[in-house]
């Protein structure tokens, strides 16, 4: 015998719940990877994407990095060169052209680099930031052109060049054209060195692969954010190759600092002050009594290196 339907519990109540269901944004809360603590998204964003309490440094967009660094959060975007899209007509599980389209829609950026010119602590500065959200910040032709354009801007305006590195390495979908960017960016760094302009690298989580093997490890000073993974091949690949367990914290910023590969591990909140001080010293900027930098003593121009 089939029992009569209970209209109150089976029909009316679900409809009432649906009618008055509160819309809750999916990203309202962020879970700390270290402690499991749940923190309001807005609170983390206002704290420059550092979890209050645990001080865990989350990934940060390129635009947010520039806003954090430049005085009053304002800067001039450096126009980046256009490059041929999908020159190899590459396809794996999906077409490379489709991957680019998805990444651009997701990030609102043409590729994985954003470069700005402005003032940091009163000093003119050129800053390049990699966007990990764009195909893991991988280095392709567009990225190589962007890095070189940033270096050229620093040379033209006689400013320090600061890089925030965040990348999974070379972009495999561009093959040899991607690998060619490693020597090209190295030449750009040599031009900065020949002109006696500081090149400071901030290694963020993660910085790996061909980016680590080229411009990310050619700085005059290497800073790193706490806990950042910095390597060529990741620890899992190395363990599978040598069949041995690696030390705790291997290839993390603190481990590399202890072994001389990183000059200093700097909390994100202290990066602007630290970089301003370093650039002031390297550019021979003298502080006025009010604490503001006076006009830097610029080095004499040096012809571009071949």
From Swiss-Prot:
Ranges for domain CoA carboxyltransferase N-terminal: 28-297
Classification via InterPro entries: AcCoA_carboxyl_beta (IPR034733), Acetyl_CoA_COase_Trfase_b_su (IPR000438), ClpP/crotonase-like_dom_sf (IPR029045), COA_CT_N (IPR011762)
Protein's GO biological process: fatty acid biosynthetic process; malonyl-CoA biosynthetic process
Subcellular location: Cytoplasm
Pathway: Lipid metabolism; malonyl-CoA biosynthesis; malonyl-CoA from acetyl-CoA: step 1/1
Main location: cytoplasm
Listed Pro residues bias regions: 296-306
Reactions catalysed: N(6)-carboxybiotinyl-L-lysyl-[protein] + acetyl-CoA = N(6)-biotinyl-L-lysyl-[protein] + malonyl-CoA
SUPFAM superfamilies: ClpP/crotonase (SSF52096)
Region described as Disordered: 287-306
Gene3D superfamilies in UniProt: 2-enoyl-CoA Hydratase, Chain A, domain 1 (3.90.226.10)
EC number: 2.1.3.15
Record has Lipid metabolism as a keyword: yes
One Gene Ontology CC term in the entry: acetate CoA-transferase complex
Keyword terms, alphabetized: ATP-binding, Cytoplasm, Fatty acid biosynthesis, Fatty acid metabolism, Lipid biosynthesis, Lipid metabolism, Nucleotide-binding, Transferase
Enzyme superclass (EC): transferase
UniProt GO MF annotations: acetyl-CoA carboxylase activity; ATP binding; carboxyl- or carbamoyltransferase activity
Record-stated family: Belongs to the AccD/PCCB family.
HAMAP family cross-referenced by the UniProt entry: AcetylCoA_CT_beta (MF_01395)
Subunit note: Acetyl-CoA carboxylase is a heterohexamer composed of biotin carboxyl carrier protein (AccB), biotin carboxylase (AccC) and two subunits each of ACCase subunit alpha (AccA) and ACCase subunit beta (AccD).
Summary of the function given for this chain in its UniProt record: Component of the acetyl coenzyme A carboxylase (ACC) complex. Biotin carboxylase (BC) catalyzes the carboxylation of biotin on its carrier protein (BCCP) and then the CO(2) group is transferred by the transcarboxylase to acetyl-CoA to form malonyl-CoA.
Name under which the protein is recorded: Acetyl-coenzyme A carboxylase carboxyl transferase subunit beta
């Amino acid at each position: 015998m089939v029992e009569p339907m209970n209209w109150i519990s089976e029909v009316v109540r679900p409809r009432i719940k649906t009618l008055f269901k509160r819309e809750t944004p999916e990203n309202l809360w962020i879970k700390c990877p270290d402690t499991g603590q749940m923190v309001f998204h807005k609170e983390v964003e206002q704290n420059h994407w550092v979890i209050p309490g645990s001080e865990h440094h989350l990934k940060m967009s390129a635009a947010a990095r520039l806003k954090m660094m430049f005085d009053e959060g304002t800067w001039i975007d450096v126009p980046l060169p256009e490059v041929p899209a999908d020159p190899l007509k590459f396809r794996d599980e999906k077409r490379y052209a489709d991957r680019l389209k998805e990444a651009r829609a997701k990030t609102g950026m043409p590729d994985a680099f954003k470069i700005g010119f402005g003032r940091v602590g009163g000093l003119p500065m050129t800053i390049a930031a990699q966007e990990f959200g764009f195909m893991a910040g991988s280095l392709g032709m567009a990225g190589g052109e962007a890095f070189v354009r940033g270096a050229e801007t620093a040379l033209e305006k006689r400013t320090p060049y600061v890089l925030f590195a965040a990348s999974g390495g070379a972009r495999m979908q561009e093959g040899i054209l991607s690998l060619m960017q490693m020597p090209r960016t190295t030449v750009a760094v040599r031009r900065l060195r020949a002109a006696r302009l500081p090149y400071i690298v901030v290694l963020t989580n993660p910085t790996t692969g061909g980016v680590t093997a080229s411009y990310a490890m050619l700085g005059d000073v290497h800073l790193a954010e706490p806990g950042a993974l910095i390597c060529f091949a990741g620890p899992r690949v190395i363990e599978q190759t040598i069949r041995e367990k690696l030390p705790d914290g291997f290839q993390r910023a603190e481990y590399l600092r202890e072994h001389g590969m990183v000059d200093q591990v700097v909390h994100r909140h202290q990066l602007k002050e630290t970089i301003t001080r370093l650039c002031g010293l390297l550019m021979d900027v003298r502080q006025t009594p009010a604490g503001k930098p006076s006009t830097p003593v610029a080095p004499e121009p040096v012809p571009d290196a071949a």
